[in-house]
Amino acid sequence: MLHEMGLLIFLAVASTGQQNLETQIGSNYCDGSLWKRVYKPQRLQKLQPSCITVTGTIGKSQTEKDGNFYVQLKLDPKPVFKKLLNDRNRKAQNGNLILRPVCVQKVTRPDAVAACKNFTPKLRIPDEGTRVMVTGTYVQDNARNHGWREIHPVTSILPIP
């Protein structure tokens, strides 16, 4: 029985005719409960694979009024990571993937308060220049004047020694 299941899984994967992007970037567990903490989630379009793990170096970061951090991540130079960026990332975000850890700062935008109410995040944002491994939901932010791709919400950020 186990052998037959393994064969079926193998055939299903092999029949696609291409290697799955999800397996190339080593996707892990994404915490779905964090979506309750996303301000205006309708602006975010989940992409495939929806849960990804990437590596790169922390760049510019700043706090946002919705309580989120905005972090630019310079992805490691792996060919598969280049596919994660679009033109808006290249032009408006200096070629970086955006990370959006949710509710990590005080919310100052009145209509965003409810998303972070009674929530204490467990994430620590490493300093600029730190090499990290990041897991979270891969999305495109379709808010006005955005259009770039992000990991939002971020499930984990781990420094790489």
Where do the language-model regions lie?
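Sec-dependent signal peptide recognition
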Residues: M1-L8
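N-terminal secretory targeting signals
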Residues: F10-Q18
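OB-fold and OB-like single-stranded nucleic-acid-recognition modules
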Residues: G17-P161
